[in-house]
């Protein structure tokens, strides 16, 4: 990632952090920059009921606010769904993998339907329990693993993404 792009993502991160703090959402949504780009991490408990892929109505405004800032840039945006490793028991989804994918797809659909995103710049991915950020042995770790990551991809991935869809 070049210096110009890094500054652009850092400015976007600062803008998001301020907006989230002003809305009291900074405990439920966090941001960081890593080698992939700007990562916006959403705590699933705020945005989804357990075992459900439907975005909670009271959380839609936060997603729309975040999307409004992201819609000003040209980068690809990948929405990743993640779960803990506890098997689903009462759900329309046979596995955590399918649940995580459905959640990612619903966030992408919201970005398109309510925020006028271009569908060709959005990617929905479900990882289920297979990319944890914390230990699934504790309740706290499982809670951290239940998340949606909205990633503003570094432009170094643009050519790769365009080649994959050809």
Where do the language-model regions lie?
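Juxtamembrane linker/hinge segments adjacent to a transmembrane helix in small membrane proteins
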Residues: 1-44, 163-166
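Periplasmic OmpA-like peptidoglycan-binding domain that tethers envelope proteins to the cell wall
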Residues: 12, 41, 47-62, 72, ...
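Short beta-strand elements
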Residues: 25-34, 75-81, 123
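Generic recognition of flexible, low-complexity loop/linker segments
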Residues: 27-28, 66, 137
